[in-house]
């Protein structure tokens, strides 16, 4: 009996065209043409799991593209309401082996105030089922171990490049507390369309990466 053929994977970068409002207040009526990129995975044999992952990534990206394309570009069209939109989004593949694939999802949302919010999350998927998996557990850690590792890494970084404003303990506390906050929340703006199973962590070739806010 021949052993089953090992599935191999490749990745293609795809894009969607987006028409992004520049600023309804300072540049009414102006829009910017952008391309938002996301990965599409190809398997050497038919894979329901890969199809499921591709559908999840494409659907999530398409939802934001459609919302941004439909977003008003003049203040009068907003009817006096605060309208939050996604001005930029990029999903990139950071890791893939025979069992797991992981992506990094970066976006910039704004309600047209003094500044918007950059949010970076990660999402890992099982290549056997296509379902999201926790990057922390996939890396063999408990949440407590991951939080401790983040604290150690931040403290080590600040030992050579300290903050001008905050103590090392304060920075470590603030960053590690992010581990307890929903990863779909960035700088006070709730992301409407996060990937299911998103995390503050993602897997990369160098190891488990913790994504801080901007």
Task: Describe each model-derived feature in a short phrase.
Residues 1-214:
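Compositionally biased intrinsically disordered regions enriched in Thr/Gly
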């Amino acid at each position: 009996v021949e052993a089953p053929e090992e599935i191999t994977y490749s990745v293609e970068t795809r894009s969607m065209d987006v028409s992004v409002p520049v600023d309804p207040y300072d540049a009414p009526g102006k829009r910017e043409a952008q391309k938002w990129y996301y990965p599409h995975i190809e398997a050497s044999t038919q894979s329901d799991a890969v199809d499921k992952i591709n559908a999840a990534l494409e659907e999530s990206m398409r939802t934001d593209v459609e919302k941004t394309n439909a977003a008003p570009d003049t203040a009068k069209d907003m009817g006096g309401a605060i309208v939050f939109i996604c001005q930029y989004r990029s999903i990139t593949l950071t890791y893939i082996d025979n069992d797991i694939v992981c992506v990094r999802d970066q976006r910039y949302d704004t309600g047209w105030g003094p500044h918007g919010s950059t949010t970076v999350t990660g999402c890992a998927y099982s290549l056997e089922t296509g379902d999201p998996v926790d990057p922390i557990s996939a890396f063999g850690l408990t949440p407590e171990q991951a939080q401790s590792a983040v604290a150690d890494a931040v403290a080590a970084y600040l030992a050579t490049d300290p903050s001008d404003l905050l103590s090392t303990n304060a920075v470590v506390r603030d960053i590690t507390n992010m581990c307890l906050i929903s990863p779909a929340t960035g700088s006070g703006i709730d992301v409407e369309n996060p990937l299911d199973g998103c995390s503050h962590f993602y897997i990369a070739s160098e190891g488990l990466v913790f994504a801080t806010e901007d």
